[in-house]
């Protein structure tokens, strides 16, 4: 496994774990990781989850879309 692949896997795992800690299904974390697409974006999402602790899945999806939008610019 390359370093980049290992870094991606670690970021994905951390993101899924943070989402599960908040009471959301693992599938939401998997979908977020796929859409965010990079460890840097996933770490931004992890920071959001740890600081805001959103209560609704919609807030997680909104933040994911905002991060994706910023990356595309």
Regions found by a protein language model. Give the residues of each.
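N-terminal acidic leader/helix
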Residues: 1-35
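Long, compositionally biased
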Residues: 44-73
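Amphipathic alpha-helical segments that form the core helices of the histone-fold
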Residues: 30-43, 48-49
């Amino acid at each position: 496994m390359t370093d980049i692949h290992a870094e991606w896997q670690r970021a994905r795992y951390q993101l899924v774990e943070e989402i599960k800690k908040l009471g959301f299904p693992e599938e939401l974390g998997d979908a977020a990781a796929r859409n965010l697409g990079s460890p840097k974006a996933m770490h931004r999402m992890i920071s959001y989850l740890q600081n805001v602790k959103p209560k609704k899945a919609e807030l997680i999806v909104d933040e994911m879309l905002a991060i994706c939008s910023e990356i595309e610019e």
